[in-house]
UniProtKB/Swiss-Prot annotation:
It comes from Mycobacterium tuberculosis (strain ATCC 25618 / H37Rv). Belongs to the pentapeptide repeat protein family. Each subunit forms a right-handed beta-helix with 8 complete coils that stack upon each other. Pfam families: Pentapeptide, Pentapeptide_3. InterPro entries: 5peptide_repeat, Pentapeptide-BTB/POZ_domain. Might be involved in fluoroquinolone resistance. Also inhibits fluoroquinolone-promoted dsDNA cleavage. Increases fluoroquinolone (ciprofloxacin or moxifloxacin) inhibition of gyrase supercoiling activity in a concentration-dependent manner. Inhibits DNA relaxation and supercoiling by E.coli gyrase. This is Pentapeptide repeat protein MfpA. Homodimer. Probably interacts with DNA gyrase. The gene is mfpA. Residues 113-147 form the Pentapeptide repeat domain.
Length: 183
């Protein structure tokens, strides 16, 4: 098992490396390429993966806690199961990935591309989806209670069976042009 603590990598090409069971703490990765990398069963705490590329990367059974994925791109990755605790995906591209059933509670997904992403049965309680691009996203049976969302999500994502707060239900109605009136 490798441990990388307080280290920094810029523009590093990790393509096709086996980094399974890697442990990072306070590591900084900027513009690195993790395409084809095996990061299965890895653990990351307080690490940042900024503007990195993850294509066909295996991340299953991994844990990310207090990490930043700012501006990183994920394409055709194996992401389930995955443990996420206070992860910042601001400006990341997760479009087209299978995130079914993941717990994204409290994660920041501001201005994240979730186009055609499968988020069915995800827990997004308290998540920040402000400005997220959600065209074709599948949020069926997801738990969105307490999440911050823009009106565009209510119009562009599939939400059959999603759990929402009353305020969110009112926002959904307004986004669809419904007029709510009492009795």
């Amino acid at each position: 098992m490798q441990q990388w603590v307080d280290c920094e990598f810029t523009g590093r090409d990790f393509r096709d490396e086996d980094l399974s069971r890697l442990h990072t703490e306070r590591a900084m990765f900027s513009e690195c390429d993790f395409s084809g990398v095996n990061l299965a069963e890895s653990q990351h705490r307080g690490s940042a993966f900024r503007n990195c590329t993850f294509e066909r990367t295996t991340l299953w059974h991994s844990t990310f806690a207090q990490c930043s994925m700012l501006g990183s791109v994920f394409v055709a990755c194996r992401l389930r199961p995955l443990t996420l605790d206070d992860v910042d995906f601001t400006l990341a591209v997760l479009g087209g990935n299978d995130l079914r059933g993941l717990n994204l509670t409290g994660c920041r997904l501001r201005e994240t591309s979730l186009v055609d992403t499968d988020l069915r049965k995800c827990v997004l309680r308290g998540a920040d989806l402000s400005g997220a691009r959600t065209t074709g996203a599948r949020l069926d049976d997801a738990d969105l209670r307490g999440a911050t969302v823009d009106p565009v999500l209510w119009r562009t994502a599939s939400l059959v069976g999603a759990r929402v707060d009353v305020d969110q239900a009112v926002a959904f109605a307004a986004a669809h042009g419904l007029c709510l009136a009492g009795g």
